[in-house]
């Protein structure tokens, strides 16, 4: 069998409801002579994630790690992976082979360290508050300035040597993004043939779940800021950019501000209650 052109690492903690669709997308239309090396790093699972992953992707290597830690799972899988470029894909995200391969191609270019396909949000099952929130979020500099992360990031061989193994952080994707200068990152929307490259994220369905997930992201951002107190020139600056347009209504901006304010309040409450290290994720978007 020929060497794999790239590796795909999928950390998964109790992702039995979604890991099949993730794996089916990874292998969709993949040529038999260029199959990726796929490692599913199931960690601390108490559901059927491992069994479903093995059934959905017989060619993948499925780890059954005892500790429920995304970062540890990514590091364990990375230590076993043999191919580069190396792409790290959340189990609740979908990205097809063509987009993964196009990202890997970009990562072979000189000077490119980290890359992601274009981000698409599936808001079809979200309430009006969440839809309004993401209409604003998608216009913010974090997303528009060479986004790497939010469910998928790829690393070149040199980048793997630079950032792996990852430290124990909440915001692993932000840590990776900030490890590279803007000119070292790429966000690609088209492959060399002009075909669309993207991955699909399924955000929380309700405003309440969105607030809980955003509070975890805030904790991750604050944790990174404290780690990098000595200064990081690649640090993502929190900048909000609001401009009323035909697509972006004042009500959208209001919803965004309200949710962000609620996130800050929840963060302070959790800190007072000693819950600042508790892992939070959205279960609604993972439901069938």
Stretches with model-predicted labels:
Residues 4-7, 37, 175:
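Cell-envelope/extracellular polymer assembly enzymes that use nucleotide-activated donors
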Residues 17-21, 46-55:
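Acidic helix N-cap motif at the loop->helix transition within catalytic regions
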Residues 24-35:
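Short, acidic, metal-binding catalytic loop of nucleotide-sugar glycosyltransferases
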Residues 25, 39-50, 67:
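A conserved acidic beta->alpha catalytic loop
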Residues 65-81:
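Glycine-rich, basic loop-to-helix element that forms the pyrophosphate-binding segment
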Residues 86:
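Short aromatic/hydrophobic "clamp" motif used to bind/position activated sugar donors
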Residues 97-128:
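Conserved donor NDP-sugar-binding/catalytic core segment of glycosyltransferases
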Residues 193-194, 204-206, 212-288:
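Terminal low-complexity segments of carbohydrate-biosynthetic enzymes
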